[in-house]
Amino acid sequence: MGFLGKKVNGSAPARTTRAAGQAGEDRALAHLTAAGLALVERNYRTPGRGGGEIDLILRERDGTLVFVEVRSRGASAYGGAGGSIGVAKQRRIVFAAQHYLLRWPAPPPCRFDAVLIEGDRLQWLRGAFDAA
């Protein structure tokens, strides 16, 4: 038995949500860098409460800054990985990106992508949503 009497499969401890998220981000980062993007920053958070967080910030070869939301799910139930990136989540990501871009004297072209991981399947959605 594991935490709160929940059965744990096998002898290894149950993975935490944070560890699973980190593993998903690692997998997404490997996929994106193999596709030619360069890592700029990871897990950027705005200061204070109510802000946003960006899982990965990468740069395309043409200079485009790419803000990436990574979502991992074991299966496609309940809308799958993509179903959890609602309008409110998109707003928080856009807010964090705007905050991040304050450090740039002349912000480069930007894009919001999503990497959806469901089991062994990885899907990269370029331009998953807009800042508008």
UniProtKB/Swiss-Prot annotation:
Disulfide feature: none
Chain intervals for the UniProt region annotation (Disordered): 1-23
Pfam families reported in the protein's UniProt record: UPF0102
Single GO MF descriptor: nucleic acid binding
Family classification: Belongs to the UPF0102 family.
The protein, known as: UPF0102 protein Ajs_0414
